[in-house]
Amino acid sequence: MAKRRKSSRTKAKETNWQERVIQIRRVSKVVKGGKKLSFRAIVVVGNENGQVGVGVGKAGDVIGAVRKGVADGKKQLIDVSLTKASSITHITRGVSGGAKVIVRPAAPGTGVIAGGAVRTVLELAGVKNILAKQLGSSNPLNNARAVINALEGLRTFSEVAQERGVPLEHLYT
């Protein structure tokens, strides 16, 4: 009976998640007997419907590292407010370490114009039309976290309308 309950819980949580590995790196730790090798995986998890997260996993084998990265990414999910044109609501910037990212909304039909880890994060968030530029560091982990930082700073149309004291319909025109 416990098995049946557990499987129904996992089915309810699993809602069409996609995962993409950005980087797998072999890392080593110096111990008394020599070097201990392990793998670090950077994974982006998203549902292409406004939720995305970046996770890092370390393990003795690649599959274990990816599995841990996916679990970590699901713990760090954020919600992204998208427009009707599958873009973001306004221009925003994100920083993580030495990586800086500028993200701008784009007209329908533009596509995702971004590179590397930034592109992967935006695609799995469900953004279809966007312009993004990486500045500073080219480190995939810092760039992925910088995009997440930028997307966390987004405000919805209703928040902007409330701050300005303007009806929501006036923002669309």
From Swiss-Prot:
The keyword Ribosomal protein applies. GO terms for biological process: translation. With S4 and S12 plays an important role in translational accuracy. One of its GO terms (cellular component) is small ribosomal subunit. The keyword Ribosomal protein applies. GO terms for molecular function: rRNA binding; structural constituent of ribosome. Keywords: Ribonucleoprotein, Ribosomal protein, RNA-binding, rRNA-binding. InterPro entries: Ribosomal_Su5_D2-typ_SF, Ribosomal_uS5, Ribosomal_uS5_bac-type, Ribosomal_uS5_C, Ribosomal_uS5_N, Ribosomal_uS5_N_CS, Ribsml_uS5_D2-typ_fold_subgr. The N-terminal domain interacts with the head of the 30S subunit; the C-terminal domain interacts with the body and contacts protein S4. The interaction surface between S4 and S5 is involved in control of translational fidelity. Part of the 30S ribosomal subunit. Contacts proteins S4 and S8. Belongs to the universal ribosomal protein uS5 family. NCBIfam families: rpsE_bact (TIGR01021). It comes from the Bacteria. Residues 17-80 form the S5 DRBM domain. This is Small ribosomal subunit protein uS5.
